[in-house]
Amino acid sequence: MSLKGRALRYLAAREHSRAELERKLAAHAESPEQLAQVLDDLQAKDFISEARVVESVINRRAGRFGAARIRHELQGKGLAPEAVAGAVNSLKASEVERAREVWRKKFGEPAADAAARGKQMRFLAARGFGSEAIRRVVSQAED
């Protein structure tokens, strides 16, 4: 299969950043120049778009994860720092509501004791929610 065909197959499954495609296709390319040419061509035809990658990750992950976890995933995809920062800033506004919804699905009722409260807080922290959002969600549940 041609390099361009492989790239299109990856892109048909989901949005990929240029850096992700470089990593995945490097083993199949005859030369780095050939790989760069294919990726330049795909980018010129708008098959590769950082904005769509960011939007895709946010749509898939925002309901289950906090801004820190999503930031880490976006950085791992090799996206521009400005695009990552913009996406994370847009998520910060709804952080408490999203954390509350994740907490409600997992626990649904206030913690009975300090150990249970710690477990709930650690769960939300592992999901990438900020400490302020976690404190607000867990303390409001007890009220």
Range-by-range predicted roles:
Residues 1-143:
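An alpha-helical, amphipathic repeat domain used for nucleic-acid recognition
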